[in-house]
Amino acid sequence: MKIVHLCLSCFYIDNYRYQENELVREHVAAGHEVLVVASTETYLDNLSLGYTSPGRYAGSDGAEVIRLPYSGPFPFFLKKKLRMHPGVADILNSFAPDVIVFHGLCGWELLTAARYRRTHPHVRLYVDSHEDANNSATGFLSRLLHRFYYRPIIRRSLPWMDKVLCISLETMDFCKALYGIAPDMLEFFPLGGYIADDETYQKYRRELRHELGFDEAHTVFLQSGKFDAKKKLTVSIKAFSKIKSKDFAFLIVGRVHESIEAEVKRLSSDEPRVRFLGWKSADELYQLLCAADVYVQPGSQSATMQMSLCARCPVVVADVPSHQPFVQGNGWKVASLEDQVSAFEQIERNPALLQAMSIRSLGIATELLDYRRMAKRLLV
């Protein structure tokens, strides 16, 4: 089949494991002809969003990538919100896809995709949505955009969509409330991940723990991300420091924003059990998660939580509605420093409970998060 992924309302970043990357990678691996059409938005330094040059090249996920500039007679700050791009209709007509996957519900080119679907009724059009009340329509200008620009575009395009794929329960609520999308048009389609087989998992776990100097008596916690105050890394370190077990270790993977860097250094300077491993590629992070015993994410949401379930980690994560499907007997939902300390104390008292939680995390990942299964879903 011929599949086009339109990443014009979101970023597409080479060498990452975001949902867009994983679905493209799975479609390529399955032998389909895949094209990615993306904006120029990307990460410039693995920390800050920026913009690259338009062009055409072979992407890291195995598909050809066409990057299009923003268009329109507007200042750049507005163009990147309106999300108009030149030549999208011509690309669709030339490539002649069987399936269109439009990533990100909010953008002008959704109309272009819907027009193509209308004139080619055999084509499937799936639109994914990451929007929710925490990240969209939160400020005055953003509310205006969503109400008077994005919503009319979405409403005009709805008759030609096959499904709106929502990454969370909060996203489903948001799409119903703000855009007026009927419940039967919405489908739960969470951020997923790669699930290693037993042999590969044990290999990663054994090799990485040996490399890091851990034996099976150690309980290894891991928190990762682009750390700002919302990630609550400082809360994690404070909670961890209250547990004195010498068999506990805390790994920090990623980059710390300068706004919290001094506090993080102060909190961890006298804590030898805390290690900074720096920035890691997606594959390296997955292997580290296989080596870890518990994934920690008490702050803002990240796709690494789903990756950690695929790596069989029990979790300590923020108590928010979007985590409800993913924390079912395999970890703790926390809303405060005290909650996090309590979770760590329970693990200290009975580390054996992590074994059953690990099995449960694998079960949840297999049921909900396997990108191989999710990629196949987009073909029907």
Show which residues each predicted segment covers:
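Conserved donor-binding/catalytic core segment of Leloir-type glycosyltransferases
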Residues: 4, 215-231, 237-240, 251
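Donor nucleotide-sugar binding/catalytic pocket of nucleotide-sugar-dependent glycosyltransferases
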Residues: 38, 124, 143, 151-203
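A charged, aromatic-enriched C-terminal amphipathic alpha-helix characteristic of glycosyltransferases
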Residues: 351-380
